[in-house]
């Protein structure tokens, strides 16, 4: 499950910041937190990874909003607020289960749409169109002008159902 978690962290950060490098930094950050099994401040993480504190904070705050890391807030002796970050098996489990739930919901909607409607696909650009839209456009793809082809949804529904069942076991 840890590998799935690391993949989720890396890809979500890379997409959010439009940078594969940020994705790799996020992966290193959570690996560090998990391997050390202790709560660390963002300054300490930045020093250990040899990256700027600003980058570390940016990544950690995004991961916190996505519930991909744990955070604790405490007051210091000089009345400043200090955040400490952690990753443990519970954080990983909750993150993966939440992502699986979101994907299951999307797959469920896709299965419902595929069972309730017929679709046509463009053989060139592979865009999918419902019957109503095909009738309005005269069976021609609005993007490339190719003739749209009817698609049997049974195989696709079966594949999606199998994926849904696998995710249900998580």
From Swiss-Prot:
Domain HTH TFE/IIEalpha-type positions: 1-93
Pfam families per UniProt: TFIIE_alpha (PF02002)
InterPro entries named among the record's database cross-references: TF_E_archaea, TFE, TFIIE/TFIIEa_HTH, TFIIE_asu, TFIIEa/SarR/Rpc3_HTH_dom, WH-like_DNA-bd_sf, WH_DNA-bd_sf
Tagged with keyword Repeat: no
Record keywords: DNA-binding, Transcription, Transcription regulation
GO molecular function: DNA binding
Single biological process term from Gene Ontology: transcription initiation at RNA polymerase II promoter
The record's note on its domains: The winged helix domain is involved in binding to DNA in the preinitiation complex.
Subunit structure: Monomer. Interaction with RNA polymerase subunits RpoF and RpoE is necessary for Tfe stimulatory transcription activity. Able to interact with Tbp and RNA polymerase in the absence of DNA promoter. Interacts both with the preinitiation and elongation complexes.
HAMAP family listed in its UniProt record: TFE_arch (MF_01909)
General function of this protein: Transcription factor that plays a role in the activation of archaeal genes transcribed by RNA polymerase. Facilitates transcription initiation by enhancing TATA-box recognition by TATA-box-binding protein (Tbp), and transcription factor B (Tfb) and RNA polymerase recruitment. Not absolutely required for transcription in vitro, but particularly important in cases where Tbp or Tfb function is not optimal. It dynamically alters the nucleic acid-binding properties of RNA polymerases by stabilizing the initiation complex and destabilizing elongation complexes.
Family, per entry: Belongs to the TFE family.
Name of protein: Transcription factor E
Organism: Pyrobaculum calidifontis (strain DSM 21063 / JCM 11548 / VA1)
Gene responsible for this protein: tfe
């Amino acid at each position: 499950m840890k590998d799935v978690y690391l993949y989720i962290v890396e890809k979500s950060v890379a997409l959010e910041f439009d940078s594969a490098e940020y994705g790799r930094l996020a992966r290193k950050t959570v690996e560090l937190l998990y391997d050390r099994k202790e709560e660390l401040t963002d300054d300490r993480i930045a020093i250990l990874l040899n990256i700027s504190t600003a980058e570390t904070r940016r990544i950690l705050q995004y991961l916190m909003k996505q519930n991909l890391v744990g955070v604790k807030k405490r007051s210091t002796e000089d009345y400043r607020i200090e955040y400490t970050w952690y990753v443990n098996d519970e954080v990983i489990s909750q993150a993966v289960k939440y992502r699986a739930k979101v994907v299951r919901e999307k797959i469920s909607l896709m299965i419902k749409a595929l069972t309730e409607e017929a679709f046509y696909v463009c053989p060139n650009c592979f865009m999918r169109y419902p019957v109503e839209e095909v009738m309005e456009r005269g069976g021609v793809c609005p993007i490339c002008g190719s003739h749209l082809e009817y698609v049997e949804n049974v195989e696709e529904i079966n594949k999606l159902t199998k994926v849904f069942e696998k995710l249900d076991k998580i």
